[in-house]
Amino acid sequence: MGVITSESEYVSSLSAEKLYRGIVEDGNIIYPKALPRFIEKAETLEGDGGPGTIKKLTFVGDFGSTKQHIDMVDRENCAYTYSVYEGIALSDQPLEKIVFEFKLVPTPEEGCIVKSTTKYYTKGDDIELSKDYLEAGIERFEGFTKAVESFLLANPDYNKDSN
């Protein structure tokens, strides 16, 4: 098995705590609202949201679903890691799983820097993923995060107590 890594970061105007809560703790509620053209349903299949939890995202139309395993949750440091191990995200490439790691770093301006690392675990050591595929993955992750950010900005009272 090979591992191919890509990284990205961008600045959010939301506090790390508020964005973290929206993505990690309230994702099952927010994802379908923030991305209604893409996500039909987000649900926890087993677990309490901590490491070992299994989540499922069901996409709109005929795009199927993905299952995620929560690997690490660190609310204090606004860090989160999960693995996609089943579903549409793995169907078009020879991948065993995709691991998403992200950390939200507070900025002096009360926003945060969204840092993400994506690790693609291939079904062989000799497999390469195209630059376009890796860039599209970064764009999807950033688009997803920015959609949650936009939802929270448009609904400022949503998780006000964590701002």
Curated annotation (Swiss-Prot):
Pfam families tied to this protein: Bet_v_1
Coiled coil: none
Signal peptide start-end: none
Chain sites annotated for binding kinetin: 68, 82
Binding annotation for trans-zeatin: 68, 82, 133
Tissue: Expressed in nodules, but not in leaves, stems, flowers and roots. Specifically located in the nodule cortex.
Domain of life from the UniProt record: Eukaryota
Gene Ontology terms for molecular function: abscisic acid binding; protein phosphatase inhibitor activity; signaling receptor activity
Cited InterPro entries: Bet_v_I/MLP (IPR000916), Bet_v_I_allergen (IPR024949), Plant_def-hormone_signal (IPR050279), START-like_dom_sf (IPR023393)
Alphabetical list of CDD domains matching this protein: Bet_v1-like (cd07816)
Biological processes per GO annotation: abscisic acid-activated signaling pathway; cytokinin-activated signaling pathway; defense response; nodulation
Induction: Up-regulated during nodulation, but not by Nod factors or pathogen infection.
Family of the protein in this entry: Belongs to the BetVI family.
Role summary: May be involved in nodule organogenesis rather in the processes related to nitrogen fixation or interactions with the bacteria. May regulate nodulation by controlling the levels of freely available cytokinins.
PANTHER family assigned: NODULIN-13, OS08G0374000 PROTEIN-RELATED
Note: The NT13 molecules that have dimerized without cytokinin ligand most probably lose their binding properties because it seems unlikely that the dimer can dissociate back to the monomer. Asp-62 from the complementary protein molecule forms hydrogen bonds with the cytokinin scaffold.
Name the UniProt record assigns to this protein: Nodulin-13
Organism: Medicago truncatula
Gene encoding the protein: N13
